[in-house]
Each structure stands twice: as structure tokens, then as C-alpha cells.
Amino acid sequence: MAPGGGRGSKTASYGNSDFVVVANRLPVDQERLPDGSTAWKRSPGGLVTALEPLLRRQRGAWVGWPGIVDEDVDHEDDPIVQDDLELRPVKLSADDVAEYYEGFSNATLWPLYHDVIVKPIYHREWWDRYVAVNRRFAEATSRAAARGATVWVQDYQLQLVPAMLRELRPDLTIGFFLHIPFPPVELFMQLPWRTEIVKGLLGADLVGFHLTGGAQNFLFLSRRLIGANTSRGAVGVRSRYGEVELESRVVRVGAFPISIDSTALDQTARHRDIRRRAREIRAELGNPRKVLLGVDRLDYTKGIDVRLKAFSELLAEGRAKRDDTVLVQLATPSRERVDSYQQLRNDIERQVGHINGEYGEVGHPVVHYLHRPVPRNELIAFFVAADVMLVTPLRDGMNLVAKEYVACRSDLGGALVLSEFTGAAAELRQAYLVNPHDLEGVKDTVEAALNQSVEEGRRRMRSLRRQVLAHDVDRWARSFLDALAESGPRDG
């Protein structure tokens, strides 16, 4: 069945919200307490920070999953108001989480879109569940949106929602943004449901990607898979949008690199408590001459093993000194029920143990590894404390950690080692750019960053900060929504 097929009559009424954000998760998490009751906990993030003021001004609503399993998926709860923000929970059963989220979203789409670092799994049952859950999100959005409202759908878990919502509510202006990389054409063509995904996205008025390459790939696929006429010229960043001509309307396609709340981070990092904590961190590490830092979700795309291998060989070759150089790796737990992630955790912990066994001393490991979430201010203090930030993904849509590190370095200290295969590399050209598949190149670049002169470091960091502070998450959201406003239905 085509996305959205046959369900147009289910929702006839209009909601009250003029602006609706649709994402896999709500900006708050619902938690089950020991007594069986539930409570809400705010889940801070860049997307929430950027869109919250707009949501408040425009009678906004946020549609998403609250984070706990609920088998009664057919019973719709009333909207929840949290801090003047209307939340529309979408319920997911245990089977939904297993097949739509852990299955199709994260064992099919995630590896496919990240260059098949791990082989994608194609299960028809997972696809059927993905269609069903996307329809549930579309119907919840239709009930929330006022007549003529603007709807912004977020990310790879919900790629069918635009077309489903278009069928339910043709009066809406619909935008879609993909937060992960969009794959090369030859990889995307492996997907058995490739045409359905492209048709799903073309339900939007504006389809946004981080990079121009993703936009160009999507235009090509629109021509190849559905025979649409498309623009042929190069797509620009926040400009020169591509176009896909459908029977009754035109879909715009653009590149909008996401960013962070850089001003807030800059201000927090300047606070004396953060500076004091940064000094304490270095003291707790034994006051080494150099501190290298990695901060990642524990994910096979992030290249954690690459930096550990490079550091191990630098120690073995004497190019990094075991008595005055340490590596701190902060790894946030992620998708722990998925087999490949469990294996990755075991592999990383084995690698850390080997390096410390080979080069550390009792009470003085050379790699400090934490596998747990780190509070926000503690993370900022680590950014301030680190001499070299290691961001070495094999593929990443953007990588906001790189930008966060730069935003925290008002002292113009530190060095950023950044994978060429992140979206951030297109903007942060003054970082030490590396190919994470080239181990010798990674080692040489890390060594250069460790030994850079003060003048060289300040020059690079000044340029990086100019970029990050000027292009913040508010500018990202405004640029997308301005383009969307120009793309929607003309007749209301």
C-alpha cells in the first residue's frame, strides 16, 4: 500500500495548533514510578531549545512518543500541557518498539543511511510495523493541527508521515528534515521499499537535509524511482533550492546544516564554577600535560575504536607519552537491546582494558572510560579541560559535539580533530580534518594537534568560533521555516 493509502476519511476535525512539530520522541520523558504512577521529566535538547519560543507564540503542539511502552495503542489520551506547551503523546506497544523503532528504524534504515558500516536487515514485518506506526503519528498530527497550520516532521523514523498527512490534511504546509546522512544513490537503491520512502517524503512541501549532497541524491532518486521532473542545477546551503514537479504541486529540496545554542554554551563555559571544575578534572586525571577527549553515544558509526587504536599506537611508538598524556572517553549508553550495540560495548571495553594493561600504571590509567550519561555542566567542564577533542565518526549527519567543543573554548585553547565524513566538516574547515579509515593519517593528525603551537591553535579556534557562534540553532530553524513558508499551499 502506498503511504497514507485509504485512510483519508478517518480524521475530519481540525485541531487548535497553528504550528506542530512531529518527532519520534516528545521533549519530555514519561517515567513509571515504583508505585505504578507516572511522572514527566523534561528532556533538554537543541531542537527543543530552538523551537520552544516559536511553539509558544503560535499555539504550538509537539507530537511524539513519551518513552514508555503502552499496549493500549488505540485509546487516545488527552493532550498534555507542560509549561504552556501542548504535548500530543503517540502510544507505542512493546511490539511497536521492537519492530518499528529497534527494528526498521535502527537495524534497517540507520545502517543503510550510514554507509552500511553494519549490514542492514530487511524484514517485511518490520516494514509493515513502520507503516502502521507512521500512520498513527500522521493521524495524531492531523488531530492536533489547525486549519492551514504548519507542520514540521523530524527524522528518519517518520519518513512516511508527510505523504500520509498530505492525504489526511491537504490544507497543511508540511516540512520534513532528516537529521542523519542521506545515503548515496547506489546504497539507497538496496532498500526494498525505496519507492515508498521517496513518495512518503514527497508528501512534504519542503524536504531538508544537512548537506547539499543529500539533497542532490534525493532529487536524482525522485527522477529515477517515480519519474518526476526535477531541477538539475546545484543545490546551495540555505539557498538555491532544488525542485521536484508533481502532478498538482512542486516540492522544494534544500540543505540546512543544523547547529547548537552556541551563545548559551559560550556563556555557561565562561562561568567560574565551570572553570573551577575543569581544573579539578585535570587534577583528578593527575595533571597530565595533554588531555584528549571523546564524547559520543556508544554507536558503531562514531569511530570510537579508531581513536583508541590510534592512541594505542601513538603510545607504542613513543609519539605520545604515557606519563603525561591521557585519553578520556565518555560513551553514553545507546540502543542496548540491539545485538550489534551490545557487541560494540564489549569490544570497546576490551580495547580500553588492553590499552590500560599495556601502558597504564596502578592507579594511573592512560584511558579513562565512562559508560553512562554525564550531566550537562560536567560535560561542559570536560570540554573546557580538554586539549584535543577527538571527533572521528565513520559517518555522521552533522555531529554537534564538535560544535559544542568549539563554543566552549572562549579562551581560544584546544584543538579539534574532526572526521571528514561528518556534516560538520563542511563548515569547520579550520579543524584538523582526518579520514578515519586511514589509521596512519589519524595518528599523524592527532600528533599534530597535540603539538600545535599556541599561535596556530588560537588562529584555528578563532576561525572555528566565528563560524559556530554566527550559525546557531536558531538561525537553522528560522532558515528552514522561512523556506517552508515560501513553499506551502498558495490557496490556504
Swiss-Prot record:
It holds the Pfam family Glyco_transf_20. InterPro entries: Glyco_trans_20. The keyword Ligase does not apply. GO terms for biological process: trehalose biosynthetic process. The keyword Glycosyltransferase applies. It is an enzyme of class 2 (transferase). UDP-alpha-D-glucose binds at G45, G46, R297, K302, L400, V401, A402, K403, E404. The record marks W110, I180 as: Involved in alpha anomer selectivity. It catalyses: ADP-alpha-D-glucose + D-glucose 6-phosphate = alpha,alpha-trehalose 6-phosphate + ADP + H(+); CDP-alpha-D-glucose + D-glucose 6-phosphate = alpha,alpha-trehalose 6-phosphate + CDP + H(+); GDP-alpha-D-glucose + D-glucose 6-phosphate = alpha,alpha-trehalose 6-phosphate + GDP + H(+); TDP-alpha-D-glucose + D-glucose 6-phosphate = 5-methyl-UDP + alpha,alpha-trehalose 6-phosphate + H(+). Keywords: Glycosyltransferase, Transferase. Pathway: Glycan biosynthesis; trehalose biosynthesis. D-glucose 6-phosphate binds at R25, Y101, D155, R335. Its EC number is 2.4.1.15, 2.4.1.347. One of its GO terms (cellular component) is cytosol. PANTHER family: BCDNA.GH08860, TREHALOSE-6-PHOSPHATE SYNTHASE. Belongs to the glycosyltransferase 20 family. Probably involved in the osmoprotection via the biosynthesis of trehalose and in the production of glycogen and alpha-glucan via the TreS-Pep2 branch involved in the biosynthesis of maltose-1-phosphate (M1P). Catalyzes the transfer of glucose from UDP-glucose (UDP-Glc) to D-glucose 6-phosphate (Glc-6-P) to form trehalose-6-phosphate. Probably also able to use ADP-Glc, CDP-Glc, GDP-Glc and TDP-Glc as glucosyl donors. Homotetramer. This is Trehalose-6-phosphate synthase. It comes from Mycobacterium avium (strain 104). The lineage of its organism: Bacteria, Bacillati, Actinomycetota, Actinomycetes, Mycobacteriales.
